[in-house]
């Protein structure tokens, strides 16, 4: 038995050593964080397994008001079923500037943090807009090569910061969440990703076509960091988080404390009420309580499609024309949503453990998004 144990230990050492030698050391962290905790993919509370940087809350927090009929309207049976089926942890409806309805599940509450996943892309795009206003970046057409000389040659020389925000970079990136060997998986678990990011090639002409790639926002975050001389967390806190009166500290996952690079394409841990604020800021054309935090023209451009053949995306925001309404939304893995109707001034926030794996015919969006919209409006219109 002792010889068997020693042999098994040596075999494990060889396997682990081989994994590192082949450049797949990040897989060991993936196994420890995901599979060893009983999950099959990244999850809402996984930020506790990573190094994070704090996005400091406002020193003058602005609590949301509540409508006179707050939580007076019952949820529809269809909405309740969706919550149960997809593991909702937070559901929030804001009318105007006030919370009209909210519910929490699974021991979450209004202060509980959970992972934004790709909703963070909307924050990074907003920071791009702010860097232009602040003079750090000249405009959407400024070349990425102005910040990183690795992009001065060939197709890469045509790459602009606007191409990164609108998902039109031509970057060689595999957007596969469940493939352990994909670059997306490596980016999530690799502790030193900065150099790897700058080694990736541009393989098709930038600015010509939409292709959703998390690497675009990762590189855009690095551009913003380089342009401002500040970490993304620091710049987000001073430019938007604090001016919007966010009540809680947020956390932004890092590749590692040693490297200190925010995962710009994902992974801000906060709560439903504070996530809703960016939706309100864009709903109000970049203005917050009378102060212009983002240029209104930039906001307007962000929530309209850049490419007519891909009307579902603008600059960092998902777009949905549904039942005569133009919605724009923040959207993240496993069904994290901030859905905005600028006409009715309604914001719907949903956070949770999973989403539908089906989509209506002809739609690029999962069916649960339509459920949350439809059932919220049944409640608002008194049809619950």
Feature map (PLM): residue ranges:
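N-terminal leader/targeting segments and the immediately adjacent pre-domain N-terminus
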Residues: 1-108, 137, 369-384
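Short, small/polar residue-rich loop motifs at catalytic or cofactor-binding pockets
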Residues: 85-88, 112, 333-334
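Catalytic-site signature segments of enzymes, centered on catalytic residues
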Residues: 111, 178-258, 262-263
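Active-site helix/loop module of the DD-peptidase/beta-lactamase fold
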Residues: 134-172, 199-201, 228-265, 270
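Active-site-proximal alpha-helical segments within enzyme catalytic domains
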Residues: 216-223, 264-287, 336-352
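Active-site Gly/Thr loop motif
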Residues: 248, 253, 299-347
